[in-house]
Design a protein with these regions (language model features):
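N-terminal intrinsically disordered, cationic/polar leader segments
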Residues: 1-143
């Protein structure tokens, strides 16, 4: 599990740190951590529905922010619990472009015991940094 929940960062919110050897791995880890805040067992989410996500942003950290917000949007608008299965991040001219395939299914309380209802990603202490081992992010979610 390339993420950990940070108990001492926020009281009414949930904070976590996620990491990976490259940007793609880090974005997937942060996406999984966000879903894991909402659903106890990520493996209970079956790949029954597919959504293609395409995002652009001039700032790399805000591209991650946008991706997590997109997953929360699908949860709120379609009751879809999605996990990122393929992702590509590249720099094109003056912006970063993300293309991802998310797979999942509609939330079923009988099969998906829930933990918390994530409302949004906050910008408070939000960061994405390159490290000796790859990339690391710290994120606080509003619940």
């Amino acid at each position: 599990m390339p993420y950990e929940f940070l108990e001492d960062i926020a009281t009414a919110d949930i904070a976590f740190s996620a990491w990976g050897k490259d940007l793609e791995e880090t974005f997937i880890a942060a996406s999984d951590a966000t879903m894991n805040v909402m659903v106890e067992n990520l493996d209970s989410i079956q790949p029954l529905e597919r959504r293609e996500i395409q995002l652009q942003n001039e700032a790399l950290d805000m591209l991650l922010f946008d991706l997590l917000q997109e997953l929360i949007y699908y949860k709120d608008s379609e009751k879809l619990m999605l996990r990122i299965h393929q992702i590509q991040i590249k720099k094109e001219e003056h912006q970063y472009v993300l293309k991802a395939v998310a797979l999942g299914e509609k939330l079923d309380p009988n099969r998906h015991p829930t933990r918390a209802d994530v409302k949004a990603v906050t910008l408070h202490r939000f960061q994405l940094v390159k490290t000796d081992r790859g990339w690391e992010t710290q994120i606080i979610l509003d619940i």
